């Protein structure tokens, strides 16, 4: 069963919004992100999932630094909204 959330997040000093589809599976919960901005949606393309495992949100490292910063900003907002800890993976020197 899928539910939907709306999440506001900051990126480059501007507030944006995303639609998040929540898919619960037996082994994890998947948060599939759609950014409500065409340019940012293109930036996130191919790397738009955040996984909740073992009670934490996990964000995989991205090759593109801007994509990593965007995904982490969305994940941080989602973490605050859901009150689920975020596993910190800021490996590319993000903001």
Predicted regions and their residues:
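A generic structural signal for beta-strand entry/edge sites
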Residues: 4, 28-30, 54-58
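Negatively charged, low-complexity tracts enriched in Asp/Glu with abundant Ser/Thr
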Residues: 1-26
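Acidic, low-complexity intrinsically disordered segments
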Residues: 41-95
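Short, cysteine-centered beta-strand-loop-beta hairpins and adjacent loop/turn segments enriched
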Residues: 14-16, 39-44
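Residue-level recognition of conserved beta-strand positions in structured domain cores
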Residues: 20, 33-35, 61
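Short, surface-exposed, low-complexity cationic segments
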Residues: 24-37
């Amino acid at each position: 069963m899928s539910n939907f959330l709306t999440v506001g997040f900051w990126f480059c000093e501007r507030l944006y919004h995303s639609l998040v589809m929540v898919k619960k599976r037996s082994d994890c919960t998947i948060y599939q992100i759609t950014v409500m901005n065409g340019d940012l949606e293109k930036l996130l393309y191919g790397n738009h999932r955040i996984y909740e495992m073992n009670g934490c949100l996990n964000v995989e490292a991205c090759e593109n630094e801007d994509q990593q910063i965007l995904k982490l900003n969305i994940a941080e907002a989602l973490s605050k909204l859901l009150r689920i800890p975020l596993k910190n993976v800021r490996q590319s020197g993000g903001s």
